[in-house]
Amino acid sequence: MFKAIVSADTLQETLDSVSVLVDECKIHLDDDTLSIRAVDPASVGMVDLDLAATAFESYEADGGLIGVNLSRLEDIAGMADAGQLIQLELDEETRKLHIQIDGLEYTLALIDPDSIRQEPDIPDLDLPAHVAIEGRDIDRAVTAADMVSDHIALGVDTGDDLFYVNAEGDTDDVHLELAPDQLIDLDAGDAHSLFSLDYLKDMNKAIPTTAEVELELGDEFPIKLHFDIADAQGHVTYMLAPRIQSN
Amino acid sequence: MFKAIVSADTLQETLDSVSVLVDECKIHLDDDTLSIRAVDPASVGMVDLDLAATAFESYEADGGLIGVNLSRLEDIAGMADAGQLIQLELDEETRKLHIQIDGLEYTLALIDPDSIRQEPDIPDLDLPAHVAIEGRDIDRAVTAADMVSDHIALGVDTGDDLFYVNAEGDTDDVHLELAPDQLIDLDAGDAHSLFSLDYLKDMNKAIPTTAEVELELGDEFPIKLHFDIADAQGHVTYMLAPRIQSN
Amino acid sequence: MFKAIVSADTLQETLDSVSVLVDECKIHLDDDTLSIRAVDPASVGMVDLDLAATAFESYEADGGLIGVNLSRLEDIAGMADAGQLIQLELDEETRKLHIQIDGLEYTLALIDPDSIRQEPDIPDLDLPAHVAIEGRDIDRAVTAADMVSDHIALGVDTGDDLFYVNAEGDTDDVHLELAPDQLIDLDAGDAHSLFSLDYLKDMNKAIPTTAEVELELGDEFPIKLHFDIADAQGHVTYMLAPRIQSN
């Protein structure tokens, strides 16, 4: 059983966070939380999303699992105006999701969850460096790095106590250093890893410029990015595997 | 003889209503009205437009007929700012239309009216159901239906006293029901017809979201859509032939 | 030695004025002025730009010459917000330009000036007609002319004391006449020349609609267009060679 009412903004934010990595996903409909875990086809980027029942206008669920086509669901949500409410109701028998927006009813055929790529186990890493940074600074770094290279190094300099971004191209380079007073928080630790810019650009699309983003970093380790959605009633974690550094 | 001054907005609205169906048209320049009738190449959609002399800043005509390339005339009108006035003057000898916008003069070669597809006779049908609906509700229905199908059913349910829209796709469906309190007016009568979404999408482009649109519907009959333009100094009627239903 | 701080707006305006004609250019870094002269590959359009040291927040230079890729430098400047300051510093040894925007450092490899097309000598012509006109009127004339033709005639009618623009297409024509009261200034003299619209469209892109543009015109002679940038701390001159008229 699943029946919920949610604002168009919240639904769009939720779907966008996942659709930057995958086209289809499984959605867990537990009694107090809607949750999604997914990994991209190359197993390089992962997403773990939780949206509390309190993020909804109303929410009733009892532990179901549905498979959805994300871009289709995004298109439907995109028909609603910003403040409008969207009603969702699962028909268990037909395995269809009834979506209502101000009298307009869309009947969406669901996907068999077994046909969707398996959900990843997102490892509980104990990474030495923690950085809290504004979404707009991630956007600036990723946009600039993309002008010169297809990969980007993120690290923490424990000596000078700063977070840095480096991108080295064939002729041009991009470098950004942020000291503690330019960050929301810095818990320095030895960290330097290289990442594919394609993935970070996709993740960056889903990060609001005003969001406070927590980064967890290590030395040639995956990076984790955490941020809130839906007025902190929802939470997204991205994990991105490092690229092997050639020196 | 034809000489007129009209606001850029009014001219654009007029041209757009016709250009969604045809590339070229004949314009009748009668002494108190400018009028256009046209049918698309497949004879599926028709338009009948009247613009009263009172919609113009000034208007002098004596029953002439000109043939124009609509997209060309739209491009010219598009050079004017929203509030600007456009002067039109026909040179009978050269068969050219002189168009002036704030000192800029564009000389447009006209098309021989005889070379343009014949104007349709728009039949005076006595259709059983009449619905008055906001332009934005037509827009919502057409946009949603377009996500699942290439045709759309419009009808009136006399039992439940409501207007409905149905679009059935291979996997997903769209359904919209509007009761009298969600409509401007409903004069129920037996009606259900299937239409090509391509045509309705084109017509929808020319219908302002704030317009009050009168629909006339029947059972496997053409639909007529009426709405005002130019502050009710002009009027547009679209007629769209039904598709044969396969059951 | 070169070290300067400049607003993003001023830098963008400067680069745009030159990039409409060429992809790479030499920049002269004199002690009180930054200047650029360039000619397009076909030697039809030329630009001569001066930006005074006073247009910068701070400026130190001693007569250097650098070669730059304009679109790359425009992309970098485009990362800054409208009001933001951009720091430029030349590393003489590595021949790289260090560009800083709010902590983000971009290291741009310069181009050997000797590998860039030679700078033109812009002739000091004594043209008989001078017209001062708003940028928006140039924009209107060029946009309209582009609808009918690929060349445009500009001239002054000394008899009627007006500046005119003519474009003749295969079927349609565009004509604009501006009398002294519709111009900022008119110093009439015999002038009529035909120009390639492609070049004038490119130059028009860099002319602000609110700019006061000085035109110098002659009879089958090049045209010169002058306008200020950077709150009159900078100045741009375009020169465009005429096309041969076929009569």
UniProtKB/Swiss-Prot annotation, chains A, B, C:
GO-annotated molecular function: DNA binding; DNA polymerase processivity factor activity
Pfam families: PCNA_C, PCNA_N
Parts of the chain that traverse the membrane: none
Keyword DNA-binding: yes
Keyword vocabulary terms for this entry: DNA replication, DNA-binding
Keyword flag DNA-binding: yes
GO biological process, alphabetically ordered: leading strand elongation; regulation of DNA replication
Gene3D superfamilies reported in the protein's UniProt record: 3.70.10.10
InterPro entries, A to Z: DNA_clamp_sf, Pr_cel_nuc_antig, Pr_cel_nuc_antig_C, Pr_cel_nuc_antig_CS, Pr_cel_nuc_antig_N
Summary of the function given for this chain in its UniProt record: Sliding clamp subunit that acts as a moving platform for DNA processing. Responsible for tethering the catalytic subunit of DNA polymerase and other proteins to DNA during high-speed replication.
HAMAP family: DNApol_clamp_arch (MF_00317)
Subunit structure: Homotrimer. The subunits circularize to form a toroid; DNA passes through its center. Replication factor C (RFC) is required to load the toroid on the DNA.
PANTHER family the UniProt entry points to: PROLIFERATING CELL NUCLEAR ANTIGEN (PTHR11352:SF0)
Similarity-based family: Belongs to the PCNA family.
Record's protein name: DNA polymerase sliding clamp
Organism phylogeny: Archaea, Methanobacteriati, Methanobacteriota, Stenosarchaea group, Halobacteria
